[in-house]
Amino acid sequence: MNAPDESGESSWPVLAARVGALLPLTSLDPSAISFLQGDGLQGTWFSACSGGADSVLSTLLAFAHFPGRSGAFTVAHFNHCLRGDASSGDEAFVHRLAEGLGVSFTSARGMGTTGDEASLREERLAFLSKVTNGHQTAIILQGHQRDDIAETFLWRLARGAGLAGLAAPRPVRRSGNMVFVRPLLTISREEVRRVLGSVGATWREDDSNTSPIYLRNRLRMGTLEAWRKDSDREVGAGTVRSRRL
């Protein structure tokens, strides 16, 4: 979906309140919320936002449920510069989202060279490491949702992973001064989009997420869909339970 017009963008706090009402803290990952309400209050918060539905919802929920953090809250966007004007549009959209919420914004741009999934991830992590440098504790909010658990399981299983690797993504993960927190792991990709759409919030669609070049996309669109079709129960809920065992 494209970015909202100016009137829609000026109402981001209203949209945040609406999604917060639809998704109370009790509907989010309990481990993530427990951390945010406890030790997480001592850190500086950064919302890693691509402009996609998942990270937009994560940003709005953080704003809605933790209003006291708005003065120490930064929306962080990394532009890989792989999709020309579309990439620039993503960055501009996220910048307007941050401005509309009245919080800080920081961004950086990559070299625009096509890389594999691991290389692109390393670029984003290097960016986050740089912007959080100097903070004793930096809380990085990410938009991973329930479907990502099944995708990651298949992806890592194919590469060979132990129990810890197969249980990723975790709701809370520490790395140096950064703590990655994923409150949406109880929410499906479909519900993320349904909630945003129901309140009139929009987001950006990244065409590369459907490109067969990337293994994760092939697993999502092919293997995982076949698994869902052939399974006698809901795959997403099952993988969440398995991860917790």
Positions of PLM-derived features:
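Core alpha/beta nucleotide-donor-binding catalytic domains of modification enzymes
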Residues: 2-221
